[in-house]
Amino acid sequence: MIPIYNSPFAVETAHIKFHKSDVSARIIRSLFDTARQYRESIDVYGSKQSFEWPLIEGEEPVLHTAKKAEPEIPAKVKVPDYAHRLPKEIQRFTTKGVYGEGEDHLSFTQGGGHGGSHPHLANEFIQALLAKREPFPNARQSANWTCTGILAHESAMAGGEIRKLPAFTLPA
């Protein structure tokens, strides 16, 4: 599997500090040769609330809230499907992807890709073009999100060396 993923690591973890915020995140991707389900996940930690991606496919994520009694801190939450906000023709792509033959990798089949975000991102981009406005995410934000993953992998390949995002990806 190493040649397929161009990585000697079956699992990669990135620890991220958000710009001008007390929020940090842990991103985990388990790819191969591990006794667990395939997983791409993000856990976000803040001083008031924290969000943890489900450990098992099909389970619900957990929202932790500070200043509660210990047993009440964690609560499973349902993440709503916002397909109804999309044009009818693409609503079905938020829960399961429809791809060509041979494209059955779990990153495609679990929720249409990244939790069903792909149709929302595509629709937002098209709507922004039609309205002649900047989309969300814009080019800088998209570069920030993409570079985060690239730099996380580079960091792993360099023994965990800290990597900083390039200036063109940071808020103006």
Show where each model-derived region lies.
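Charged/polar positions within long, soluble alpha-helices
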Residues: 154-158
